[in-house]
Amino acid sequence: MDRTINIFNTAFKKLFDESSIENILKYSQPILDKFGHNIELKLQYTQVKPTSDYKDIERNHVRAKIKYLSKQIDKPHIFLNEARLSAIAISIYLGMVKRHIQGIPCKVLFLDDIFIGLDISNRLPLLEILKSDFDSYQD
């Protein structure tokens, strides 16, 4: 089990390491910027470890640090309204899609009910992002 957890931690950590080519935010932050909320996101991964009885895992979480207009936000759970949270979530999702480039001719984006819950401040930027950054997915 320890070996498996080490393999997972090593691979997953690369998604959050700023110097890694696998870093999520290399693709997600530019998308988030296009929403115009002036939010800078930093993600920190706390490595998984087994419980002492090896029946479960603990410390398996990702923490988000937020800056707004270059100022650190100490209580993001209070600061982030639904529109900002939606923009962050969509940016991470689309950043992961962009990061994992598909070398196949048919590129599909599954957005399902994403537009239903979006307010107008996010709908228009999202349409622009899809048009500019995911044009090859719209064929």
Language-model region placement:
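Conserved D-loop-proximal element of ABC-family nucleotide-binding domains
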Residues: 82, 103, 119-120, 124
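Short, flexible loop/turn motifs enriched in small residues
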Residues: 55-62
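Amphipathic alpha-helical domain-onset/packing element
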Residues: 3-55
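Conserved ABC ATPase signature
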Residues: 63-93, 118
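Loop/turn-to-beta-strand initiation segments
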Residues: 105-107, 135-139
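ABC-family nucleotide-binding domains
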Residues: 112, 116-120
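Short basic/glycine-enriched coil/helix segment immediately N-terminal to the Walker B
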Residues: 80, 98-107
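Conserved hydrophobic alpha-helix in the ABC-type ATPase nucleotide-binding domain
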Residues: 90, 125-130
